[in-house]
Swiss-Prot record:
Key component of the proton channel; it plays a direct role in the translocation of protons across the membrane. The lineage of its organism: Eukaryota, Viridiplantae, Streptophyta, Embryophyta, Tracheophyta. This is ATP synthase subunit a, chloroplastic. Pfam families: ATP-synt_A (PF00119). One of its GO terms (cellular component) is proton-transporting ATP synthase complex.
Length: 249
């Protein structure tokens, strides 16, 4: 157990700090206190948030009894997110719809912005812009939020009895069950980061090697896989929350 505790502490103190320093492309930073902040991630994240908030305001500003095209689309998205949440969490899915929906929409729009918006042609004094999910810090932050959410879900329903899951079905599995909770955010973050990074790199390489028209099918494939990655992340987040509330694996 001492070895396991030391390994976990080393991962938290050193491993995650080193992961946050992973760079792809040219970055620029803001100095806030004693920390260097990836400024391009904040800028593009604000753009994505502004798109989501602006779209929501336009739709709900004047709701119609007979929905318009925009209202129809957002109602469809809401029903889709509700279905995903109910399927994975169960009958107590209601309070978690906003969280799952926010994850899905933020990741979806972030991924698509990387494929559709020409971030890299915007001239900066140093560095370049890219999709928020093209940065490991964003995906790790989203994964850690998911971890906090499923711990909160389990504790709020079962209290301290939630931790009994670590010794089920036998106390021998305690180290493995603890390790599982650390691998969940890692798998979520690296899956999303790796897929979005790969999509962008493939498009950049093809555009540099062949005429502009040829990479278009690959770009459409990237849009499809970007949407799938957003759905996978949101579905797994809902599944983890449902699992923590039900206490099964």
């Amino acid at each position: 157990m001492n070895v396991l505790s030391c390994s976990i502490n080393t991962l938290i103190k050193e491993g995650l700090y080193e992961i946050s320093g992973v760079e792809v492309g040219q970055h620029f930073y803001w100095q806030i206190g004693g920390f260097q902040v990836h400024a391009q991630v904040l800028i593009t994240s604000w753009v994505v948030i502004a798109i989501l908030l602006g779209s929501a305001v336009l739709v709900v500003r004047n709701p119609q009894t007979i929905p318009t095209d925009g209202q129809n689309f957002f109602e469809f998205v809401l029903e889709f997110i509700r279905d995903v949440s109910k399927t994975q969490i169960g009958e107590e899915y209601g309070p978690w719809v906003p969280f799952i929906g926010t994850l899905f929409l933020f990741i979806f729009v972030s991924n698509w912005s990387g494929a559709l918006l020409p971030w890299k042609i915007i001239q900066l004094p140093q560095g370049e812009l890219a999709a928020p999910t093209n940065d490991i810090n964003t995906t790790v932050a989203l994964a850690l939020l998911t971890s906090v959410a499923y711990f909160y879900a389990g504790l709020s329903k079962k209290g301290l009895g939630y931790f009994s899951k670590y010794i089920q079905p036998t106390p021998i599995l305690l180290p493995i069950n603890i390790l599982e909770d650390f691998t969940k955010p890692l798998s979520l973050s690296f899956r999303l980061f790796g897929n979005i990074l790969a999509d962008e790199l493939v498009v950049v390489v093809l555009v540099s090697l062949v005429p502009l028209v040829v990479p278009i099918p690959v770009m459409f494939l990237g849009l499809f896989t970007s949407g799938i990655q957003a759905l996978i992340f949101a579905t797994l987040a809902a599944a983890y929350i449902g699992e923590s509330m039900e206490g099964h694996h």
